[in-house]
Amino acid sequence: LATDLITNGTTRVCMFSSLHTDATLVLMDELERAGVTGYVGKVNMDRNGLPGKLQETTEESVQETLRWLDACHFEHIKPILTPRFTPSCTNELMTQLGKLANERGLYVQSHLSESTNEIAWVKELHPECSQYWETYDKYGLWKDHTLMAHCVWSDERERAAIRDAGVVVVHCGDSNVNICSGICPVRRMVN
């Protein structure tokens, strides 16, 4: 992967790895040795996954994230906290990740408003939040340099919250077309 990135002219990345700590460290090492710079995140998810395979317990997720952070000694590839998205993280996990982000000065990346079904699901899980973005804000994960993937269905209020907080929208048109989730209103965001 790292060599392919360089061969194709990609020299900077911001990537989701997996919830597996050792695999994430291997990816980071490969990227570092290939000369790629950027951020890689060990994915956190303690609900709505596949228990034992693609889902950790809250305690495992926090402990493995700490182990991963303590092992990150790369010069050009930096760690970024990566709660997969609100539906895959319990309140306790989001609280712990928010503390880590603030204590260690770490950037955060996740998903936001990828589809209307996802937004409805988040409302079911967090009826106390009137908007999806608030589920990150309440845990200290909505801040300057937070990266949010997709943002296809972000309304004017959410776009204002993105702008006001200094959150960065990361959008890949091919990805959203592939999963038929919609087209990000990039022009509205730029204006």
PLM region spans:
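Short catalytic-loop micro-motif centered on adjacent basic/acidic residues
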Residues: 12-16, 80-83, 147-149, 170-172
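Divalent metal-binding segments
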Residues: 1-23, 87-93
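Short, charged beta->alpha transition segments
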Residues: 1-3, 65-71, 158
